[in-house]
Amino acid sequence: MTINEIQDEIIEEFADFDDWMDKYQLLIDLGNSQEPLDEKYKVESNLIDGCQSRVWLQADYVDGKILFTAESDALIVKGIVALLIRVLSGHTPQEILDADLYFIEQIGLKEHLSPTRSNGLLAMVKQMRMYALAFNAKG
């Protein structure tokens, strides 16, 4: 699936819920469904700066595609990073760099997050794009 196809799928899933409490529950469920991050990756260098919660992000470059794994100590943040991984993991660095992450606005996520969580979301996206830039430069 393309990045946009995945985003459209997420938009449809969130459209099934009218109440934001249900959408938060969906985020929590998504976070809990993620494979836990291997303890060896829970190191300072994998922590994302700018997040109030602790978020570890690991990126591996395999066969020209970036595979992201992550974990957070906060339930909703864990769900947010799970969404980002779902959208961006398994794509080429250039696809990630070119991606317009419109699903964030479309599902209303940005407007329903506290300012600190919103900053954390931006920090997660920035870090994923930084990995894409680095892997793109390596070719």
Where would I find each of the regions flagged by the language model?
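N-terminal intrinsically disordered, cationic/polar leader segments
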Residues: 3-11, 15-54, 61-64, 104-123, ...
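General beta-strand recognition
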Residues: 65-69
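A short interface-forming secondary-structure element
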Residues: 72-73
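Hydrophobic (often cysteine-bearing) scaffold residues that line and stabilize catalytic clefts
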Residues: 77
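Alpha-helical support elements that line or immediately flank enzyme active sites
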Residues: 81-91
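Glycine-rich phosphate/pyrophosphate-binding loops
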Residues: 90-107
